[in-house]
Amino acid sequence: MIFLMALVLMYGDFLFADFSPFDAGRLTIYTVPKMLLMFILLMSVYINRSISSFFAIVFGILIDIYSGLVYGVHTFGMVAFVFFMHTAFRVFYKDFVAMAFVVLTLTFLYDAYIYTIYRILGLVTLPIFDYIALRGLPSLILNALLFIIVFIITLQTSKVRKNLLPKH
């Protein structure tokens, strides 16, 4: 069930790519949803850090293969951000607003991490201010809207998993 949901969210991320970029006047705005990343981060809280790390590796590899630019960037990034989430959540345990803030901040930082790596390698030429104004913040707003949906999916998935586990 978890794997299937992660596949659906990854497909949703790729599907949103068809709608981005869009033009607003003379500006081209990019929105990059990170539903899969938010799901994996929330899994580290509501399901298990080990399972979340496993999914980060598997789906990081799939995204690396799909993008085909630099192998390992997404895999390493997802695993690292799962550990950041696990560390941060110890501080903000059971506080929804703080958890949402941490997940959205880590999602923004993950996107900035990908941008930085690609920028260093010369694969992206977008200046930093343009990145923040035309991609970073619009993506953050989109991900904030999608967070509620991903949060509900994560809660439902964790309940299904707990119901399927044998009771001792």
Question: Where are the model-predicted features located?
Answer:
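Terminal, non-globular segments
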Residues: 1-168
